[in-house]
Amino acid sequence: MERAVPLAVPLGQTEVFQALQRLHMTIFSQSVSPCGKFLAAGNNYGQIAIFSLSSALSSEAKEESKKPVVTFQAHDGPVYSMVSTDRHLLSAGDGEVKAWLWAEMLKKGCKELWRRQPPYRTSLEVPEINALLLVPKENSLILAGGDCQLHTMDLETGTFTRVLRGHTDYIHCLALRERSPEVLSGGEDGAVRLWDLRTAKEVQTIEVYKHEECSRPHNGRWIGCLATDSDWMVCGGGPALTLWHLRSSTPTTIFPIRAPQKHVTFYQDLILSAGQGRCVNQWQLSGELKAQVPGSSPGLLSLSLNQQPAAPECKVLTAAGNSCRVDVFTNLGYRAFSLSF
């Protein structure tokens, strides 16, 4: 007579809750530490996890090396965006941005240094902050999101110094033209707007969906991602992923991908994009698809390139989105492994 296989011991309530959290997790944002050896990831539960890239990439790495060094509750709602200065990690959620000291987080002391809320129109308004952008030359931070405005904060004093108005719906993404003091913003209204930081005025508007070759009405007009490289911009979302010549406001390359893209970046002579679907796409500027590299998440929301010169051994691409995992690509050709909350 066969022996009955004993049932698994029921998990405790905490373990069940954590397993359900991981099952329904979305990772919205990532940021590399100033030393290049650590990666912060922010999720839909308001948690930030700090991973040790140097440990995970080591030849002696174990499964435990791919788990967070520390995880802490940073916001009440999702952590939509993060950036790092030479000392701080800045994180944004619903209505406010917070600062954390990298040195303290790595010692597992996760106490916020400060928090700031932009001057919203009413005290009842708590719009999400979808995008953060550092402007190193003026030591400032630009925040944008659900109130359809760009707010500039002086990082030295913590005061808000300017508001840029023009979008008619919420803003998804920001990019900096480093050679000129200009910022690009893309939003739900289907427009990419260029702002001159010297005059605090809008100097150019590209309504992408109005260009027939880019328009995809069934996907909507929203702009979910953009990046710039001097005179060139690439953007996507509802409309097709498109490379634009900024001076002439003309689309030069339409990239042949149907799925809406949520993140895009220039890398050397390539453009990297990700969105609906599990692949990181590598494009030639001509529009040719060089490679599609599958990851472990069904959809991707965030790409991060670690190019910190202080840690060349940690030079990796990381991708995250609709799962509890952060995929690590040690070269662009394949996924080496995944970090996990």
From Swiss-Prot:
Its main location: nucleus. Keywords: Apoptosis, Developmental protein, Disease variant, Intellectual disability, mRNA processing, mRNA splicing, mRNA transport, Nucleus, Phosphoprotein, Repeat, RNA-binding, Transport, WD repeat. WD repeats lie at residues 22-61, 74-112, 124-165, 166-205, 215-254, 256-293, 295-339. SMART domains: WD40. GO terms for biological process: apoptotic process; central nervous system development; mRNA export from nucleus; mRNA processing; RNA splicing. Belongs to the WD repeat THOC6 family. Pfam families: WD40. Component of the THO subcomplex of the TREX complex which is thought to couple mRNA transcription, processing and nuclear export, and which specifically associates with spliced mRNA and not with unspliced pre-mRNA. Plays a key structural role in the oligomerization of the THO-DDX39B complex. (Microbial infection) The TREX complex is essential for the export of Kaposi's sarcoma-associated herpesvirus (KSHV) intronless mRNAs and infectious virus production. It comes from Homo sapiens (Human). InterPro entries: THOC6, WD40/YVTN_repeat-like_dom_sf, WD40_repeat_CS, WD40_repeat_dom_sf, WD40_rpt. One of its GO terms (molecular function) is RNA binding. PROSITE patterns: WD_REPEATS_1 (PS00678), WD_REPEATS_2 (PS50082), WD_REPEATS_REGION (PS50294). One of its GO terms (cellular component) is THO complex part of transcription export complex. The modification Phosphoserine is found at residue 180. This is THO complex subunit 6. It is found in: Nucleus; Nucleus speckle. Transmembrane segments: none annotated.
